[in-house]
């Protein structure tokens, strides 16, 4: 039975996160995928590259599943399957690409890096844009950029994870992080080998606090070094997007 790798996009504002929720009344990305796939006869397990939190979007989440219904590896047959899946997942989830991969492929454990973009609006967005950007004003832009660069490299991010979330190893490596502007928005791009729960929201929030003189650079460094927690507020997830997962 062939294994499929799919790159998907979804609107996180309508979901309570990627993972299945204990409260069955809450809508999850994975639950919606399972329902949509079942409607075309696919009842395989679906494995994701990561679990995005409530309100976090994705333009490049990676999942894998198996299906015996479409054994033909020809491009036309795979595109037909993608079309069928998108018809069932519309309007909040889209399968952007679909390929047959080796049966040993695992979207989470085989991933070398993941990247996120955070869209920040310095002005209050309209009700139509509000679910897709975070309303945050940068103080001093130079200070903000300096704070972001302090995260680059390998650190113990024990104080950059959501309270109550357990992780055995909090060591993570940030390969790249930068700030730029596009069409009136401040955008933070970050790429790392993995992220703790709410880590990106806490990182950007701490950098914003430093740019506004609400947090000293010494305190920021103490927190990055895993010595002491000073900043504790994860900013709104509205503008956060999982944009790519990298493999060999």
Curated annotation (Swiss-Prot):
Q: Which residues form the signal peptide?
A: none
According to the lineage, what is the superkingdom? Bacteria
Q: What class of enzyme is it?
A: isomerase
GO process annotations (BP): tRNA pseudouridine synthesis
Q: Is Isomerase tagged as a keyword?
A: yes
Q: Which GO terms describe its molecular function?
A: RNA binding; tRNA pseudouridine(38-40) synthase activity
- UniProt EC number: 5.4.99.12
Q: Which residues form a coiled coil?
A: none
* Record's keyword terms, sorted: Isomerase, tRNA processing
Active-site positions on this chain: 53 (nucleophile)
Instruction: Write out the catalysed reaction.
Output: uridine(38/39/40) in tRNA = pseudouridine(38/39/40) in tRNA
CDD domains reported for this sequence: PseudoU_synth_EcTruA
The record's section on InterPro entries has: PsdUridine_synth_cat_dom_sf, PsdUridine_synth_TruA, PsdUridine_synth_TruA_a/b_dom, PsdUridine_synth_TruA_C, TruA/RsuA/RluB/E/F_N
Record-annotated residues binding substrate? 116
Stored HAMAP family: TruA (MF_00171)
What's the subunit arrangement here?
Homodimer.
Biological role: Formation of pseudouridine at positions 38, 39 and 40 in the anticodon stem and loop of transfer RNAs.
| Protein family according to the UniProt entry | Belongs to the tRNA pseudouridine synthase TruA family.
Its protein name is tRNA pseudouridine synthase A
Query: Which species expresses this protein natively?
Result: Helicobacter hepaticus (strain ATCC 51449 / 3B1)
Q: Source taxonomy lineage?
A: Bacteria, Pseudomonadati, Campylobacterota, Epsilonproteobacteria, Campylobacterales
